[in-house]
Amino acid sequence: MWAFLIISTLAWGIAEIFYKKGNLEKEKYSHLKTTVFVGFFMGIYALVILFTQGVDLKLFPKNFVLYLPVALCYIISMVCSYFGVRFIEESLSDPIENSSCALVAILCAIFLHETYSVPAIVSIAIIAIGLISVSFFDKKGKNTRTNKFGKKLAIVAIAMPFCYMLLDAVGTFLDIFYTDDVTTTLLVGVTEDTIEHTANCAYELTFFLFSICVLIFLKIKKIKFFDFGENSQEKHGFFTKILNQKWKILAAIFETIGQATYLFALSEGGGIAAVILGAGTVITSLILSRIFLKEKLTWIQYTFIGIIMVGIIMGAIFGL
């Protein structure tokens, strides 16, 4: 269990740093290019899962279609994240995005009439207070973004982590109907051993097809995929072009590594795995952002990020 947990946590934390370095504010479509790279590597791993983990190949096309609503929620949330990180600090966006567990609990309470223990409710309140406060005390960042990008883009940028949180929460909520119980799942022909892998494979192949659609869009827009910038007229060799996109490629590779290991970590580790994955990824990205990206928030923001972390850990422990 610990090997999978450590690999998944580190991989996703490192991926966040490469996302920031690869999604450049001056490169208009960098977030879409990142989406293409992630989809490509996800597609490769999906084929590995499809042929090695006992997924029913005959029924998979039907399960692929059935799982589309969930997969699209997850994928679009990630595109929002890629766009937002072009303009805001990774240290700020990641804790917000990883707070979706609180929103999932609220959705379950409203639509499934689930009840929660007092500590679980307290954890939701802690996360909510932290989220509101960390964005409220982002005055310096707001002013900087407004002066640099304009008021409209500054608002859109800070909204992106919240869009990720919302869409990821909706996807996780819908996932309950697919992967929570093999006897009531909307998927067909799955067992306890294959239900998670079937859903995971459907998500990854959807990401691959989504990335192809994005690539077609970029082609229609006449965007040169490997250009240094949208207006670049310079001629570069193939390997130079690949090297220029190294941060996006590395982000996609580490994202896929995290995706490849987290299911095994969760299946073996239960609640403690959820705590480490949720909190560990944020802590890793915070530390790496400070070291490699030289990001520095105010002490008030770090305080409220710490409060969010406490809420996330409590939520994982008490069953959110």
Where are these regions (language model features)?
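Loop-to-transmembrane-helix transition segments
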Residues: 1-8, 37, 50, 56-80, ...
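Transmembrane alpha-helices of multi-pass small-molecule transport proteins
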Residues: 7-18, 27-76, 126, 197-227, ...
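Glycine-/small-residue-enriched transmembrane alpha-helix faces in small-molecule transporters
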Residues: 1-30, 145-201, 253, 320
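Hydrophobic transmembrane alpha-helices of multi-pass small-molecule transport proteins
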Residues: 46, 107-108, 118-139, 300-319
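Structural motif at transmembrane-helix junctions in multi-pass transporters
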Residues: 25-31, 80-96, 183-184, 197, ...
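Membrane-interface helix-cap regions at the ends of transmembrane helices
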Residues: 42-62, 110, 133-145, 208-244, ...
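Hydrophobic/aromatic residues within transmembrane alpha-helices
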Residues: 22, 34, 84, 110-116, ...
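Alpha-helical transmembrane segments of compact multi-pass small-molecule transporters, enriched
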Residues: 41-45, 96-110, 206-209, 258-261, ...
